[in-house]
Amino acid sequence: MIRRRLLLTAALLCCLTTPPLHADERPHTAQPNVHVLAPMHMFGLDRERVVRVYLPPSYESTSKRYPVLYMHDGQNLFDDATSFIGEWGVDEMMNELARTQQLEVIVVGIDHGDEKRMTELNPWDNDKVGKGEGRDYLRFVVGIVKPYVDAHYRTLPDRAHTAMLGSSLGGLISHFAMYEYGDVFSRIGIFSPAYWIAPEVREFTRAHALAPGARVWFYAGSMEDSEMVANMDAIVEIMRAQRASAPALRVEVTPGAVHNEQAWRAEFPHAVEWLFEDAR
């Protein structure tokens, strides 16, 4: 068990933070409606971060306003050339959802911090990884990124039209955000959450209540770390027991799926369609 956990830690460090070999030789695959913003300063962390914005197909030809989905690990979302082992293809999938389901959402991808990823996306300290910086990271998302996006793009800025989704450590920080910033985010996607690195998450979940009207999509693959599905199920049961604030929950486990972008890419369109089904 300990060996498997160490291997997963190594995978989180290498697979999601180390630049791939010959990345500069791969063609850029981001669609024309993905825009890369100038780096933004992260107050409290004294770093800068690139933010990527996907705009729906109708954005330039209409005056309508759109819901917004905030995602982590922006390098892996839109462009094969900036990803580690392949992009999610969020831009292509959102274009297809707009065409076939009339679902149009602005997607904001916040790049991860490379070697800082394991602390930036964890709200709690960890003896092996370091001091948790997740609270500062979320203050950056809510206090800097979201106001900029709302000021420069035609968004629907209210809680009912604002979502967050992430995988692995991105799933962990999205879980934390739905409680700490329940007045900002009402729709949360939690893919393959790294609950194992933050055992405090269970007591945190028991001690907090979600704001009314939350929608939460949980996902894991059956062939991930042996504790992945069990940890996720334990969190789901805690949330379901909170009758007064029980959110709309959807839990999906894909047989044979592992901890990688390919699995998350396959799950993404189903999660997004469900999360926004009552907000079009």
Language model features: what each stretch is:
Residues 19-23:
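Sec/Tat signal peptide C-region and signal peptidase I cleavage site
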Residues 24-280:
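Non-catalytic cap/lid and distal C-terminal segments of serine-dependent acyl enzymes
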Residues 1-2, 46:
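Short alpha-helical segments used as structural interaction elements across diverse proteins
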Residues 3-12:
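N-terminal export leaders
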